[in-house]
Amino acid sequence: MNLNINTLFASFPSGLAQGLLWGIMALGLYITFRMLNFADMTVDGTFTTGGAVTVMLIIAGWQPWIAVLVAFFAGLLAGLVTGILHTKLGIPAILAGILTQFALWSVNLAIMGFSANKAISVNTYSLAISSRYVPHAILTGFITAALTVAVMYWYFGTEHGSAMRATGNNPEMSKAQGIDINTMKMVGLALSNGLV
């Protein structure tokens, strides 16, 4: 591989397209680590779960955007499991995340038909974002990231979103104000893992 300045500039557009989508994952991590003060290890498993669900649905003939939406809900469920383990069963936050992460390894293999990888090609399947069509990929990534940030900004400005932010900042005071902090933690974990 020739490493020169031209190669660097040639790889910039596809890196930008991928980086925009990775930014959504960073937003999901921000919700648990910064807003809820919850060290969530579940995201290691839900990242793979989202990919496994998306790939298997695209291979089955589903549209990529519908597959991504279903993968979002799969992540929601995984985050909810972590939330239930922590809030309802009293398992410490870090351990609840690790338990869910380990469980997701088996779940991910089952989703993919007990195969460690699945081949997916832009030649065979209609993909929403591909490095082959870089201008389209950058535009799609930018629109997706902008819409996600806008919806999250709106949500965290609502009463429910403010209650979630308050839960992370000061759980004792939030509880004194009548906020169900366990529900807020579960919703935050579900939302975070869905975005990842």
Model-derived features: positions:
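Membrane-interfacial amphipathic/re-entrant helices at transmembrane-helix boundaries
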Residues: M1-M25, V53, A60-I66
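Transmembrane alpha-helical segments of multi-pass membrane transport proteins and ion-pumping complexes
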Residues: W22-L27, L76-I84, W105-L109, V149, ...
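Membrane-interface helix caps of multi-pass small-molecule transporters
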Residues: I31, M56, A60, L77-L80, ...
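Short, non-helical or kinked segments that cap or interrupt transmembrane helices
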Residues: T32-G50, L85-L99, A163, V187
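Alpha-helical transmembrane segments within multi-pass membrane transporters and channels
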Residues: W62-F102, I143-A146
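Transmembrane helix-bundle core of multi-pass membrane transporters
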Residues: A93, G97-G157, M186-A190
